[in-house]
Structures are given as C-alpha cells and as structure tokens.
Amino acid sequence: MLQSILRRIVKALLWFAAGSVLVVLVLRWVPPPGTALMVERKVESWFDGEPIDLQRDWEPLDKISDNLKIAVIAGEDQKFAEHWGFDVDAIQAAILHNERGGSIRGASTLSQQVSKNLFLWSGRSYLRKGLEAWFTMLIELLWSKERILEVYLNSVEWDEGVFGAQAAAQHHFRTNASALSAQQASYLAAVLPNPRQWSASHPSSYVSRRAGWIRQQMRQLGGDEYLQGLNSSRRW
C-alpha cells in the first residue's frame, strides 16, 4: 500500500517536472498569454464587486526604452547579469534585516519575480517558495537574460490592473514604452516594490528620492554598454 502511494507520488512529481520544463521551454519563444498575477488581480476585483479591465500590450524588448531596462535592473536587481537566479548576498542581508524587526525586506531577483508573476499565487508558504525556486532555475537554464528581462518588463504590475511597460508608459506618462526618458523610467522603477500604493506619475517625496537614487545607479551601471554585455558572459 505504502509503496503504491509512493510510486504515485513519484510519478506525479515526474509529470509535473516534465510539464513545467515544456511550458518554460515554449515560453522561451512564445509571449505568455497572461500571468497568474493577472488572474489573481481579476478574481480579486470580482470578489470586491468592482471588476477591472486589465491593461497590457506586449512589446518586444527592442521596442522598449533602454532607459527602462537599466532603471529596473538598477532598482530591483543590480547583479542580474551575474547570478543564476538568486542573489545570495541580498538574501542574507534581507534575513538579517528582518530578524532585527521592522518592515519586511524582500530579496527577489528579476528571475524570481518572473517566476512568481507567471506561475504562482501570492503568499510566503514553503510550498510556494519551493515552486518559485524550481521555476527560477528552469528560467535561468532555458532562457537568455534578454528573454528574462523582456518577459519581466511585459508582465510586471505598475498600477491597479496595469501590466507591462507599454501599458505603464501610456497610463502614467501618455507615451510609448520606446520613448520613455531616463527620468520617467526611474519613476516607474521606483514604484515597483509597491505599485498599487505608489504612483510614478504622482510621486510621493519618498518615490522621488528613490527615483533620484535609481538614476545615479543607472549611470554607474553604464547604460547602453551594460545592456550590450548582458548576454556576453554566458548562455546557450
């Protein structure tokens, strides 16, 4: 009886592993039709009695301003080009910060955020964290860094029901993602930790200070030169 149960569990895990590899491999080339986070936001709005229309327009990476690419890397994951999905130093710093009390600090890389937004529900359970790690490893193994950045910029939330760079550029600045200035991009990147509470187009003093810091980091990263070398170190 026990052996039969174990065999079924192993078989289910193997099917899940194979299926998830296939899905991630397909999404290496095919734009995701939607994300788990979009579904979650839509369902939440139904339960709240105020259904929302999701705003999202997929844009190829070369149609998105380099300013925005650098801004989100500067603000969210400065070791993006170097790591394989996990920033160990940031994780250790977040653990120490959280142990001291106060606000909870995250340490998710862009790759982890893509995994969470695409495939998973909100929460901090061990199961969800384990699945996030699994999908992050698959994405890092099967996608290029440019593809990870492209999917991130097209799936991240920038206001209530506003997903992706093009929708965000239109919503906040009445422009296209390709035309975002360094200042506009820095404000969009500055609100990413809490995009439903902070506004890129009507920034608080904190968001303005954070945007200024992000612009400094953008210059230090090297701008276009950084992007040109993004994939040169590794990938097949």
Swiss-Prot record:
The keyword Membrane applies. The keyword Cell inner membrane applies. Disulfide bonds: none annotated. Pfam families: Transgly. One of its GO terms (molecular function) is peptidoglycan glycosyltransferase activity. It is a single-pass membrane protein. GO terms for cellular component: peptidoglycan-based cell wall; plasma membrane. The chain crosses the membrane at residues 12-31. It is an enzyme of class 2 (transferase). Pathway: Cell wall biogenesis; peptidoglycan biosynthesis. HAMAP family: PGT_MtgA. Belongs to the glycosyltransferase 51 family. This is Biosynthetic peptidoglycan transglycosylase. It is found in: Cell inner membrane. Its main location: membrane. NCBIfam families: mono_pep_trsgly. The lineage of its organism: Bacteria, Pseudomonadati, Pseudomonadota, Gammaproteobacteria, Pseudomonadales. It comes from Pseudomonas syringae pv. syringae (strain B728a). Peptidoglycan polymerase that catalyzes glycan chain elongation from lipid-linked precursors.
